[in-house]
A protein has these predicted regions:
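Bacterial N-terminal signal peptides that target proteins for export
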Residues: 2-15
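Bacterial N-terminal signal peptides
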Residues: 12-24
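Sec/Tat signal peptide C-region and signal peptidase I cleavage site
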Residues: 24-30
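N-terminal leader/targeting pre-sequences
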Residues: 31-217
Length: 217
């Protein structure tokens, strides 16, 4: 059955349709197609991460949004040759927005194992992963007292071998769980929170109408 449409109804439908298109465009524009950021060395262990007397280790990250998954590429330089690491996305950073240690930091929260890394003989490495990252990466455990989804918008990597950080004061009898054997060394480098939203750099579309800020998926 067809219904007659008056000129007024046609005008209303046109306005609603135009608004829907505009709203949709704004949502798409709010989500960046890619983002880039640098990781910051853990000051306690930077001398074991790089070559003594050499330039400061660096790590740059680029994430490109995809239709079904995102592509993250990490490139590092000035690393001590042949060192191995384990990369994770985590809920919290140990740093403040200015890159200094956060005195209120207690733990990294939820962590997702993403990739192994290893420097070559020149102290460089590059690795690429494809997974859900920008604005949506999360995990949850319904058995926990807080079963809600938890985002992991920070990125960091840990020394794979605790002995590689022993000369800088790491207690090798107390390894961290950040490798496949759960016998890793300390944090080597990690991302910083945004100074305004306090969210990690994998959130490109923050919602500042909430307190604390959240991320629009």
């Amino acid at each position: 059955m067809k219904f007659a449409t008056s000129p007024l109804n046609k005008a209303i439908h046109a306005v609603v349709f135009a608004f829907a298109l505009t709203s949709g465009s704004q949502t798409l524009l709010a989500q960046a197609s890619q983002t880039e950021f640098d990781l910051v060395p853990n000051a306690k262990f930077v001398d074991c991460l790089g070559v003594p007397g050499g330039p400061t280790p660096t790590a740059h990250v680029k994430v490109v949004r995809g239709r079904f998954s995102d592509t993250l590429t990490i490139t590092a330089d000035n690393i001590r040759p042949r060192l191995a690491f384990d990369m994770f996305t985590v809920q919290r950073s140990s740093l403040r927005a200015n890159g200094t240690p956060d005195p209120a930091f207690k733990n990294f929260g939820l962590a997702w194992y993403q990739s192994d890394l290893q420097a070559n003989s020149s102290g460089k490495f590059t690795a690429t992963i494809k997974t859900i990252l920008l604005d949506q990466i999360f995990g949850f455990d319904p058995d926990l007292s807080n079963p809600n989804p938890i985002n992991t918008f920070h990125l960091g990597f840990w020394f794979n071998d605790p002995n590689d950080a022993a000369a800088c004061g790491f207690d090798v009898t107390k390894p961290t769980p950040f490798n496949g054997e759960h016998e890793a060394g300390p944090l080597a480098m990690i991302s910083k929170p945004n100074p305004t939203t306090k969210l990690g750099p994998l959130c490109t579309n923050p919602d500042t109408s909430t307190s604390p800020a959240t991320c629009n998926p």
